[in-house]
Design a protein with these regions (language model features):
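Sec-dependent N-terminal signal peptides
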Residues: 4-14
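Short S/T/G/P-rich N-terminal loop/turn motif that feeds into the first structured element of a domain
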Residues: 14-95, 105-122
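Non-heme di-metal
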Residues: 98-100
């Protein structure tokens, strides 16, 4: 019986995990390239996201009715962790010399957000 229990525990460690997904639809501003945007995203990872357990990937359309629409998909352990990170990010925006404010300025120069939604995985 113990072996069966351990098998279950080891085989399904993520069963109770419910990640939070932060999905932002955006379009590139004139003069911004995907290469430039990807560098901003990498700087965001290095300066902010990695320390908080926030992962991000960018979805680039391969087939879509809106080929100019891209998606930022951020993933973190749960909604509470996302909320704490977002609170800290927003608080830092009041200081234009803070890392988050400087990153946000670079994001705004490069893209315009069209939509934002949060999802919980099941």
């Amino acid at each position: 019986m113990k072996k069966l229990m351990w098998l279950f525990v080891l085989a399904f460690p993520m069963a109770a995990q419910a990640d939070y997904l932060d999905v932002i639809g955006f379009k590139m501003n004139p003069g911004c390239t995907m290469g430039k945007y990807q560098q901003i995203v990498q700087d965001f990872r290095d300066q902010w996201a990695n320390a908080r357990g926030y992962k991000v990937e960018i979805l680039v359309p391969g087939q879509s009715s809106e080929v100019g629409m891209y998606y930022w998909v951020g993933r973190i352990s749960n909604a509470e962790a996302f909320g704490k990170g977002l609170d800290a990010w927003m608080s830092a925006q009041s200081d234009p010399n803070s890392g988050p404010a400087m990153l946000m300025a670079r994001f705004r120069e490069c893209v315009t957000n069209q939509s934002r939604a949060g999802y919980i995985t099941r």
